[in-house]
UniProtKB/Swiss-Prot annotation:
Protein name (record): Defensin-like protein 75
GO biological process, one term: defense response to fungus
Major localization listed first in the record, in broad terms: secreted
Assigned GO CC terms: extracellular region
Membrane-spanning intervals of the chain: none
């Protein structure tokens, strides 16, 4: 019985470590990823109204990700104060 409890504790610990490791390696990208990254990625993003693009790697493949324009924080504060 004690051996089964010990095995359960070890299993839970391993699962938690794997989840933590996966979250630590995750990258947050503020972008809309459309499809595979190729030479047409920039044209595709510009045709959809985006100003910037990047090729982001997810696990074993690379995707074309269109990034929305960044908003200046100071510009937003100035608009709120007026």
């Amino acid at each position: 019985m004690a051996k089964i409890k010990s095995l359960d504790v070890i299993t839970v610990a391993i699962i938690l470590l794997l989840v933590i490791a996966d979250q630590a390696t995750a990258i947050t990208v503020q972008a809309d990823c459309i499809g595979p990254c190729n030479d047409d990625c920039q044209q595709l993003c510009k045709s959809k109204g985006y100003t910037d693009w990047t090729c982001a790697s997810f696990r074993t493949k690379s995707s074309c990700c269109c990034k929305p324009p960044r908003h200046q924080i100071f510009e937003q504060n100035a608009q709120l104060n007026n």
